[in-house]
Swiss-Prot record:
It comes from the Eukaryota. Disruption phenotype: Dwarf, narrow leaf and low tillering phenotypes. Residues 5-121 form the Response regulatory domain. Belongs to the ARR family. Type-A subfamily. It comes from Oryza sativa subsp. japonica (Rice). One of its GO terms (biological process) is phosphorelay signal transduction system. Expressed in flowers and panicles. Pfam families: Response_reg. The modification 4-aspartylphosphate is found at residue 55. Keywords: Cytokinin signaling pathway, Phosphoprotein, Transcription, Transcription regulation, Two-component regulatory system. This is Two-component response regulator ORR12. The lineage of its organism: Eukaryota, Viridiplantae, Streptophyta, Embryophyta, Tracheophyta. Two-component system major event consists of a His-to-Asp phosphorelay between a sensor histidine kinase (HK) and a response regulator (RR). In plants, the His-to-Asp phosphorelay involves an additional intermediate named Histidine-containing phosphotransfer protein (HPt). This multistep phosphorelay consists of a His-Asp-His-Asp sequential transfer of a phosphate group between first a His and an Asp of the HK protein, followed by the transfer to a conserved His of the HPt protein and finally the transfer to an Asp in the receiver domain of the RR protein.
Amino acid sequence: MSSPHVLVVDDTLVDRHVVSMALMRHNVRVTAVESVMQALMFLDSEHDVNMIVSDYCMPDMTGYDLLMEVKKSPKLAHLPVVIASSDNIPERIRKCLDGGAKDYILKPVKIVDLPRILNYI
């Protein structure tokens, strides 16, 4: 069985790198992109993604926008989406979870978050 493949979406290079490296330490293949549009283009052409971890606050489109695009697509709706944000805003957290996100984690993503996140694959 091949390693799980996670798409990491974050407009901040450091945050993309931190999440990617943490996942790779758990034998996860990672593709990292910097925008929702890049994520959607990648998902349109790539069929072996097992989960998406997305920042919430990004220019142009938010992680919630990505979540909505994924959930309305018959091809992608099955994918678990985890939203990561440095903002602990209860209304935003509820909106994402009600919209179908598997989890909403606070940044910086910590090593202790990974087993829970990886359990969604």
